[in-house]
Amino acid sequence: MHYFALGVKNNGGVEWKILFTQQKCGKYDAIMFDLKLKELFLHKLLSQPLHSLGVQLINQDMFFGRGAFSEKFRIKRVALVGLGAVGSMVANSLAHSGISKIGLWDIDVVEPGNICRSAYTINDLGKSKVESIASIIKSINPFIEASDICENGSWEYNLDDDRVFRSTSFYDNINYKNQEDAIKELDGYDLIIDCTGSNEMLHFLSYAASNIEIVSLCITNHAYDLLCITNRDGNPFELRKAYLSRIEQDTKNFYMEGAGCYSPTFFANNCDIAALVNLALKDLNQNLDNNQLMHSTIYSYSQRGVVADRISTYRLEGYDISLNVSSETLFDAEDIADAPDGDIGYIFGYYSKDGKQIMITHIVDALNAKDILTDVFATSKGLIDYIGDYRYSKENPDTYNQDSYDQIVAKAEDESINTNNPLLAVRNPDGSVTFFLYINGELVKFLLIS
């Protein structure tokens, strides 16, 4: 007895038929061969009756009705760049959620070490990752058209039996001479999801494709953290550089043996990666359903469970300068006790090279500031440094006193301090925090962007 399913497209839906047949019920034509020593009979199958166990007509809405993403996400054309552990899981989840227009970029083939923590199977070994993911998507979504999947990256064998990568894509040749080609290649996509973990790739996309919504997913060693960085909060490359530098990672113990994309590569099992990746996709879906790209978020495993540390963005009044600070950093600031002189603590962080983006990574109490700064300065390899003061205002909300102003001016003029434009964070009587930047001889207020 043999069973199989047959799907036939019918009026916008797929008519699924569950069929079975029995070999003994077939009609055969016997062909005789005289081999001198004995006769050999071969039976040629002429017909085989198929019996139906059931027929069900399912359209696309019914097929994905139990678990589809919002329509506002599903209609987007997604450019998925990087198909390793993270990227393959993203592709798998997008396919199960009804995303049907997708471009795929990668230059690797599937190797044995990839299987344990990705969407690939043993049947994909030796194939290009792009080809394998395209096949997986088609196997999940019967409504997808071949033209809806754009494959960028394949491996072929030449006449000398050498494996050669075939691509005209920007992926395998990241440089700024081909920016125009890259923009053309990404033309028509509504959302770029970068899963490469590559600084070069994110830098390239952040500048070459800044007019397209960008989500960059990057996982740390042991999958303790997943950074989901979006260009809703500014330049993704600068954001990831700052907030990845804040995380104290295990930079010594990487996986060295076996086959995989990189050697060394990070430790992390399938469950840990999938949990964080799907949390990020869940947040992305909910925000897109509300017609907005999600704020950058750092998902971390902690003693409290999984923490979603969301980045808030402020804009400086009258200037093209933005400020980023995470919710966990603001919680830390709330826990710092008031001081009689109003001098509560200090702000650490990073200025982008063009000076248009300021990223706060720490707000710490004055007593422990020196030791903490020494530690984070070393952890970030000099990227994170002092950038401002944190003070308590006994005055009206959203204001500062003369003493706070004088201290900030003194810091700006102190050549031993590595900033001419220090921040002032003021804790208001209700516990909220207002941020100011010293610029052109005055303290200018930042306004929160929704």
Tell me the role of every PLM-derived stretch.
Residues 1-76, 434:
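Glycine/serine-rich phosphate-binding loop and adjoining beta1-alpha1 elements at the start
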Residues 1-28, 32, 172-175, 190-288, ...:
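E1/E1-like adenylate-forming module used to activate ubiquitin-like modifiers
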Residues 40-60, 291-328, 333:
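Phosphate-binding loop/pocket of nucleotide- and phosphate-handling active sites
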Residues 68-109:
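Glycine-rich adenosine-cofactor-binding loop
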Residues 77, 190-191, 213, 385-388:
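Structural motif
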Residues 107-145:
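Glycine-rich phosphate-binding loop and adjoining beta1-alpha1-beta2 segment
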Residues 134-189, 196-199:
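A structured beta-alpha segment of the ubiquitous adenosine-cofactor-binding alpha/beta core
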Residues 311-385, 394-450:
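Conserved beta-strand-loop surface patch within small alpha/beta domains used
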